[in-house]
């Protein structure tokens, strides 16, 4: 069959530059010997170099046309092509419950969702690499005090060391995206336990960053009553982008300890969804 036509509704931008594809494939070398799962292989420009790593490889592709192309041009991959939506997969079943490396030239329209799913399976994914929008990569790698520091930054950096590796320009894609891209690598840090109530931690992070112009005192009033003595702590005069991951962990412990009846804590996504049109 001929070349696959990129589909806008799937966020497809096919990489044309083989040297960049090889560089992306080489980012998985930090986790040697582990099997590899590639998301959104398209026509296999990255896949061909991943397969040279001599490790078990599976690919997940939703586009039926791309699947047909892969089956025709990568016969050795035949039994390891998963025609499905990555976001709906049970990742525990892919490699018999064993850890694996996640990589890909990720579809731009779901890149953030891919990383939230990665966090759900963080104990199975010690390393995640790949290419995404430059803006999203900068957010993930951002530190406290940065305008791009946000929900993704905190939640990912709580569990992973993040490396912004290099920038990729628009002209090496078909079709060229309207934004620059970047290659990043996320490697699990030594954290095995967060040191706080993880569900409350996520709620506080999402709630405060969805109201990032407000001080913590105002943004978490839905969780902690303003009359609570804890609200007098100077930390509540800060805005969320001023806090490190560790400070968010400490804040979570303070808030939980201050609540009189812990069973009354509402771990509701409804609170966290406030301002969901804002960037994560």
Swiss-Prot record:
It catalyses: adenosine(1518)/adenosine(1519) in 16S rRNA + 4 S-adenosyl-L-methionine = N(6)-dimethyladenosine(1518)/N(6)-dimethyladenosine(1519) in 16S rRNA + 4 S-adenosyl-L-homocysteine + 4 H(+). S-adenosyl-L-methionine binds at residues 13, 15, 40, 61, 85, 105. It is an enzyme of class 2 (transferase). The keyword Ribosomal protein does not apply. PROSITE patterns: RRNA_A_DIMETH (PS01131), SAM_RNA_A_N6_MT (PS51689). GO terms for cellular component: cytosol. InterPro entries: KsgA/Erm (IPR001737), rRNA_Ade_diMease-like_C (IPR023165), rRNA_Ade_Mease_Trfase_CS (IPR020596), rRNA_Ade_methylase_Trfase_N (IPR020598), rRNA_adenine_dimethylase (IPR011530), SAM-dependent_MTases_sf (IPR029063). It comes from the Bacteria. Pfam families: RrnaAD (PF00398). Coiled coil: none annotated. GO terms for molecular function: 16S rRNA (adenine(1518)-N(6)/adenine(1519)-N(6))-dimethyltransferase activity; RNA binding. Its EC number is 2.1.1.182. Keywords: Cytoplasm, Methyltransferase, RNA-binding, rRNA processing, S-adenosyl-L-methionine, Transferase. The keyword Nuclease does not apply. It is found in: Cytoplasm. Specifically dimethylates two adjacent adenosines (A1518 and A1519) in the loop of a conserved hairpin near the 3'-end of 16S rRNA in the 30S particle. May play a critical role in biogenesis of 30S subunits. Belongs to the class I-like SAM-binding methyltransferase superfamily. rRNA adenine N(6)-methyltransferase family. RsmA subfamily. HAMAP family: 16SrRNA_methyltr_A. This is Ribosomal RNA small subunit methyltransferase A.
């Amino acid at each position: 069959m001929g070349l696959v036509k990129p589909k806008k509704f799937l966020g497809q931008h096919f990489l044309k530059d083989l040297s960049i594809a090889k560089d992306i494939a080489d980012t998985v070398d930090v986790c040697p010997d582990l099997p590899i799962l590639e998301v959104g292989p398209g026509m296999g420009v990255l896949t061909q170099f991943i397969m040279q790593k001599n490790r078990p490889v599976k690919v997940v592709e939703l586009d039926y046309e791309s699947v047909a192309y892969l089956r025709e041009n990568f016969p050795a991959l035949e039994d390891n092509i998963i025609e499905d939506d990555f976001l709906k997969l049970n990742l525990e079943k892919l490699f018999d419950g064993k850890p694996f490396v996640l990589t890909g030239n990720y579809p731009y329209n779901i890149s953030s969702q891919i990383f939230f799913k990665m966090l759900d399976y963080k104990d199975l994914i010690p390393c995640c690499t790949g290419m995404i929008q430059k803006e999203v990569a900068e957010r993930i790698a951002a530190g406290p005090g940065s305008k791009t520091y946000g929900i993704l930054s905190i939640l990912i950096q709580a569990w992973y060391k993040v490396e912004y590796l290099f920038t990729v320009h628009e002209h090496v894609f078909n079709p060229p995206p309207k934004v620059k891209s970047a290659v990043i690598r996320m490697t699990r840090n030594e954290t095995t336990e967060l040191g706080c109530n993880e569900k409350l931690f996520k709620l506080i992070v999402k709630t405060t960053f969805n109201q990032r112009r407000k001080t913590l005192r105002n943004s978490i009033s839905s969780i902690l009553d303003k009359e609570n003595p804890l609200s007098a702590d100077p930390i509540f005069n800060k805005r969320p982008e001023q806090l490190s991951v560790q400070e968010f962990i400490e804040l979570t412990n303070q808030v939980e300890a201050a609540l009189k009846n812990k069973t009354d804590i509402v771990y509701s996504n409804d609170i966290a969804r406030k301002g969901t049109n804002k960037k994560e």
